[in-house]
């Protein structure tokens, strides 16, 4: 490390003080250093020191646009407490001073201090405003002339030579300074330490990478002396209090890894690899919410960095509103609630140090994080609706004005002299206003910004068309709009969004003729077939977003005048085909959009899910133009472009980071030149294409992190990829013809995930067994693979899966050193014994050996103390398991079905008594069917092995015979329950199942479910699954009065019924009380039922009905309301004609093949949140299908037994 980098902060401060020189002598000092290095902190220290002497100090944060003298002197006056920034309830006009008056007051205030010298600090110079701007253009230099010696201290990130100034370069912290910053967090770091971390720390220390085997020493090393990295991490750890397993894993990967791995991490996670900082990266990763939590935190994070880059610092309230405008909190039912969510995120950012506050409630991000790169995300434009921060650009004349949240609306702080200029409201709030009159009020006539979420009145367009001063108009999710012609007169618009208006089928061709200032246009979710050609003339247009316009058949010609475009996003325009025009034949094509080379500012291009058959050309060179490259384009997204046949010359895209053509099933050609000059390409995804080969130039994409070729069924051989030394993920699963992968993997030291499943490989790639950092090796269903090499060097391997490799007979070497393994799946292989020393892997969590028919015995597994899942189902020759499982306290699932075991291993008491544990014994000779009622005695009396004798009476309640099947049918079944299966009513005796809460009834001869419940004395059933019961014509027929006497509140919450041919009713007319608390109902293949309920089940939240041939209506009432129903799925109900209820709070709705169900004016209306398109043949185009495809939480399922 250079000597300069070891300069202490105290030494730098001394240099600065020396450079200021003697009193009475003007001077200029410039502090230069990267973002987050501490320049502003040093400036504050200097200001404190000189203030104690004879100095006045003035600060100017130049990370905001200062465009006029008035703004400049208002900033200075606020510092001197002459004026104050407005707060809620204040009227800004009362605080307003004329410019000359402001200057005089500033002078008077400075004279009061009786200090002869002045230090002017220009912080973050050049980010939004320059020194020249304020000193010369805004005449600050003249204003300060009466000070004979003005000393100027400038901080900036870039280094440039200047005359008559002293430049001091600020380097990293010294080791002692870093430790001082970390000192207060020592106890916190100790509390986060995992049990295996001390071993890793010792290894790093032994290798001389850190001085002491502590987390502090590790963070010190990885932080590279960047104070911002240390501060943000410590604040983040304090904020989260505890880390999830996923966060601990990331911590371990980023902080407890060898420095030799940082280069690959930099390639993946940093824009400028030389400035990659693992500690900053960790702080970002800790920001990500749990996968089950859908908060827009990450979108907001990337927005604040983009905002600062283009608009500078922001007033905190404005920043939250910008997040709302970008759609991060959609759907917005209440502006108040959306704002509160944004405020919560903003405070979290501040608590973590990601946002910092300046004077006047202005906030700035920790800009050192702007070097981060998250290729897993869709990018700023991929998640934003407007890109409004780029339109605004820090110019307060183009912003939102001074706004306030009041009465569930955001509006301008209203003064006595001026009208409201900004209104942001939801449809729910506007319902309280008189329709058609709200925007005609006198105080609304100067409106410049109008943002409406889900408005619901018809006169909207007419009212808005009269507001001629509008700059920003956003109408989001308004189904009632079918015509916007009158809005064409709003000539001053900079931003226009009309999205989610599924009834809008046409926009006049001349609509945009006079909107010459338009910069952002979002027409997503419309039913338009053609985009107005006058868009071509919008020379200031930056954002063109038409996502999910499924009827769109053409585009404007972007090469006419729209040269400033930064994003073109037409994702989901499924009818856009041919050549971006409505022509059907090449001879009719006139060259529209043939070449995009003139769009030199384009960053994001998304053609996903369109039917385009070609891409535009990206280079142009003629007598007047030389556009040989498009250096700004970073994302080219072509997912599911099913008619795209070839990739053209992509060489001009020199800074492309992501090329994604996954699902372009007709893609058959990729030119060699496509991958030339791709030094910045990080992700290449050609999955599910028809490419017969991969271009040889792949070898030159040296910084590639992910190579994804899943399900490329025609590729037989891959060219050498051994030069891709930064590769981390390599996936060729499903390439069924792939026989050979050329080149050696020996130098791919960063590779951590390899998937070779379902390929035709007979051996693994050369030297793949030497990759010590490999974490996942997945080789499922490689039917030609007979042997594997010695895997002893894969010391970081965590997942090893060779299931379905039916010819695999041998795995060489020992697993003794693979201490990180936590999942091993050897199912359906030809192995006669387990790999050597696998029984020594104390961290193993899953051992899955399904259908290993040659496996006769297992080694002693007592050391697998962390085992969670143990599955040997279908191992027909397995007749013995050595020793006891009693020490496996984490054990959750044991599947012994279909084995030849005669005895059962002793299970841990803590495990088997936990309500979330399952034992599957079906088709196992451990226990005979007629012995279920004496299961404890049966196991105890066996002459060999252990018994359940030590686990107590509750054991019997935790045994699962067949109910596991319902996890496959219905993935919303929670993980932490056991389903007791009653295939015949005599299988289990009453005493063992009376307390069951979840029960399945299959192929049972009983006439009703209630008779079974009575027979088995089951009074606390919460979930019931019923199928293939041929005699049942009614489910529940017990008397309602008797039910009420048994329980004041019935327990049944979930009911799933299928294949009941005689069922005509869910309950008799006197038995409906049992459904009082029902939340979820699924009815499938019940051909005789005509209606579901005579009364409204008030607590129903989810309803799915399909394949019921005689079902005429859902509810046998004239009209009712299911206020709690969130999800409705109706499929193939040929005579259903009436719903019979209103669903005001419906969130997801799918109605398919219900030909008689026609929307009528007198039909109770589905809630406004849903656009309920009913179709005979097609699913709703804007809804998600049955929730079985997207469960609310992941569920584990073993094979059906």
Curated annotation (Swiss-Prot):
GO biological process terms on file: defense response
InterPro entries linked to this entry: LRR_dom_sf, NB-ARC, P-loop_NTPase
Region Disordered, annotated ranges: 1162-1201
LRR repeats mapped onto the chain: 469-491, 492-514, 517-539, 540-562, 680-701, 703-725, 726-748, 750-771, 773-795, 796-818, 820-841, 843-865, 866-888, 890-911
Listed Basic and acidic residues bias regions: 1162-1180
Annotated Polar residues bias: 1185-1201
Chain residues that bind ATP: 33-40
Alphabetic keyword roster: ATP-binding, Leucine-rich repeat, Nucleotide-binding, Plant defense, Repeat
Pfam families: LRR_RPS2, NB-ARC
Coiled coil location: none
One of the record's GO molecular function terms: ADP binding
Stated role: Potential disease resistance protein.
Record text about domains: The LRR repeats probably act as specificity determinant of pathogen recognition.
Family: Belongs to the disease resistance NB-LRR family.
Name the record gives this protein: Putative disease resistance protein At4g19050
Species this chain originates from: Arabidopsis thaliana
């Amino acid at each position: 490390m250079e000597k300069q980098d070891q300069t202490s902060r105290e030494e730098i401060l001394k240099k600065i003080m020396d450079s200021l020189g003697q009193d009475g002598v003007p001077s200029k000092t410039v502090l230069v250093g990267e973002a987050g290095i501490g320049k502003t902190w040093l400036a504050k220290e200097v200001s404190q020191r000189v203030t104690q002497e004879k100095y006045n100090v003035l600060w100017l944060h130049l990370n905001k646009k200062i465009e006029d003298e008035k703004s400049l002197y208002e900033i200075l006056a606020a510092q001197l407490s002459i004026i104050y920034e407005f707060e809620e309830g204040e009227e800004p006009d009362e605080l307003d001073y004329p410019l000359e008056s402001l200057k005089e007051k500033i002078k008077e205030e400075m004279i009061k201090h009786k200090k002869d010298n002045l230090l002017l600090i220009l912080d973050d110079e050049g980010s939004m405003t320059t020194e020249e701007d304020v000193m010369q253009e805004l005449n600050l230099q003249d204003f300060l002339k009466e000070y004979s010696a003005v000393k100027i201290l400038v901080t900036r990130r870039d280094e440039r030579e200047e005359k008559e100034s002293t430049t001091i370069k600020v380097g990293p912290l010294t080791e002692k300074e870093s430790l001082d910053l970390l000192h207060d967090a020592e106890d916190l770091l100790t509390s986060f330490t995992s049990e295996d971390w001390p071993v890793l720390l010792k290894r790093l220390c032994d290798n001389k990478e850190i001085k002491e085997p502590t987390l502090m020493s590790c963070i010190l090393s990885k932080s590279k002396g960047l104070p911002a990295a240390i501060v943000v991490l410590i604040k983040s750890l304090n904020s989260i209090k505890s880390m999830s397993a996923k966060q601990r894993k990331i911590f371990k990967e980023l902080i407890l890894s060898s420095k030799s791995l940082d280069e690959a991490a930099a390639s993946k996670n940093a824009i400028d690899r030389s400035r990659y900082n693992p500690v900053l990266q960790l702080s970002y990763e800790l920001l990500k919410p749990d996968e089950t939590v859908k908060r827009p935190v990450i979108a907001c994070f990337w927005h604040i960095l983009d905002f600062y880059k283009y608009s500078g610092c922001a007033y905190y309230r404005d920043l939250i509103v910008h997040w709302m405008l970008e759609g991060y909190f959609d759907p917005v039912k209440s502006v108040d609630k959306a704002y509160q969510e944004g405020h919560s995120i903003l405070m979290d950012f501040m608590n973590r140090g990601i946002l910092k506050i300046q004077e006047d409630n202005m906030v700035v991000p920790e800009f050192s994080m702007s070097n981060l790169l998250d290729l897993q995300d869709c990018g700023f434009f991929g998640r934003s609706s407007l890109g409004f921060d780029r339109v605004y650009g820090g110019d307060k004349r183009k912003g939102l004005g001074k706004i306030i949240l009041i009465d569930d609306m955001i509006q301008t702080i209203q003064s006595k002299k001026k009208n409201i200029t900004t209104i942001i409201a939801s449809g729910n709030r506007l319902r309280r206003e008189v329709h058609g009159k709200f925007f005609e009020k006198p105080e609304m006539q100067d409106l410049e910004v109008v943002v409406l979420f889900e408005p619901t009145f018809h006169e909207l367009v007419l009212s808005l068309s009269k507001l001629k001063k509008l700059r920003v108009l956003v109408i989001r999710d308004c189904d009632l709009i079918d015509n916007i012609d009158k809005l064409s007169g709003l000539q001053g618009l900079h931003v226009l969004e009309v999205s989610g208006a599924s009834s809008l089928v046409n926009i006049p061709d001349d609509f945009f003729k006079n909107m010459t200032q338009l910069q952002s246009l979002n027409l997503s979710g419309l039913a338009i077939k053609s985009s107005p050609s006058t868009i071509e003339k919008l020379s200031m247009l930056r954002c063109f977003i038409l996502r999910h316009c499924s009827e769109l058949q053409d585009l404007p010609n972007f090469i006419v005048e729209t040269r400033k475009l930064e994003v073109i996003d037409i994702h989901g325009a499924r009818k856009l085909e041919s050549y971006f025009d409505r022509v059907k034949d090449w001879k009719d094509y006139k060259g529209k959009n043939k070449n995009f080379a003139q769009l030199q500012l384009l960053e994001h291009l998304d053609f996903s899910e369109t039917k385009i058959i070609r891409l535009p050309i990206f280079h142009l060179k003629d007598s007047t133009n030389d556009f040989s490259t498009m250096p700004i384009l970073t994302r080219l997204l072509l997912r599911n472009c099913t008619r795209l046949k070839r990739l053209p010359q992509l060489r001009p895209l020199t800074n492309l980071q992501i090329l994604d053509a996954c699902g372009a099933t007709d893609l058959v050609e990729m030119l060699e030149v496509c991958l030339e000059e791709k030094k910045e390409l990080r992700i290449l995804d050609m999955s599910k294409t028809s490419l017969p080969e991969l271009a040889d130039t792949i070898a030159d994409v040296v910084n590639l992190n992910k190579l994804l070729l899943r399900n490329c069924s025609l590729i037989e051989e891959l060219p050498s990829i051994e030069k891709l030394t930064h590769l981390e993920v390599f996936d060729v699963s499903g390439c069924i013809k792939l026989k050979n992968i050329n080149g050696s993997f020996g130098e791919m030291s960063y590779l951590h995930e390899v998937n070779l499943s379902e390929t035709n490989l007979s051996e693994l790639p050369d030297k793949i067994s030497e990759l010590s950092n490999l974490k996942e090796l997945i080789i499922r269903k490689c039917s030609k693979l007979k042997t594997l090499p010695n895997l002893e060097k894969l010391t970081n391997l965590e997942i090893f899966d060779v299931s379905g490799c039916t010819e695999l007979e041998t795995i060489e070497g020992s697993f003794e050193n693979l201490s990180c393994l936590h999942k091993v799946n050897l199912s359906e292989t030809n192995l006669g014994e387990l790999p050597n020393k696998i029984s020594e892997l104390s961290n193993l969590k899953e051992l899955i050996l399904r259908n290993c028919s040659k496996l006769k015995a297992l080694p002693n597994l007592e050391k697998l103390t962390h085992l969670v899942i143990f599955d040997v189902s279908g191992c027909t020759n397995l007749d013995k398991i050595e020793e006891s499982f009693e020490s496996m306290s984490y054990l959750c699932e044991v599947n012994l079905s279909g084995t030849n075991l005669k005895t059962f291993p002793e299970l841990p008491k803590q495990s088997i008594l936990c309500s979330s544990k399952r034992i599957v014994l079906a088709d196992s000779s451990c226990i005979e069917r007629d012995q279920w009622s004496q299961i404890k005695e049966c196991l105890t009396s066996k002459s060999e092995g252990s018994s359940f004798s030590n686990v107590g009476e509750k054991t019997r309640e935790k045994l699962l015979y067949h109910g596991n099947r319902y996890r496959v049918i219905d993935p919303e079944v929670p993980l932490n329950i056991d389903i007791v299966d009653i295939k015949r009513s005599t299988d289990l005796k009453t005493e063992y199942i009376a307390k069951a809460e979840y029960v399945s009834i299959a192929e049972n001869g009983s006439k009703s479910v209630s008779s079974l419940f009575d027979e088995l004395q089951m009074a606390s059933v919460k979930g019931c699954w019923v199928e293939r019961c041929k005699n049942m014509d009614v489910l529940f027929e017990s008397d309602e009065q008797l039910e009420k006497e048994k329980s004041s509140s019935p327990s049944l919450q979930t009911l799933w019924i299928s294949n009941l041919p005689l069922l005509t009713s869910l309950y008799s007319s006197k038995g409906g009380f049992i459904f009082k608390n029902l939340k979820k109902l699924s009815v499938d293949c019940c051909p005789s039922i005509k209606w579901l309920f005579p009364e409204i089940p008030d607590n129903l939240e989810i309803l799915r009905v399909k394949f019921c041939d005689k079902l005429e209506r859902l509810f046998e009432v004239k009209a009712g309301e299911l206020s709690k129903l969130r999800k409705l799925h109706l499929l193939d109900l040929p005579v259903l004609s009436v719903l019979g209820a209103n669903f005001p709070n419906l969130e997801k709705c799918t109605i398919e093949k219900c030909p008689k169900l026609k929307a009528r004016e007198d039909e109770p209306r589905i809630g406004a949140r849903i656009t309920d398109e009913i179709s005979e043949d097609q699913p709703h185009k804007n809804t998600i299908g049955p929730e079985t495809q997207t469960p609310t939480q992941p569920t584990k399922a073993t094979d059906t037994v």
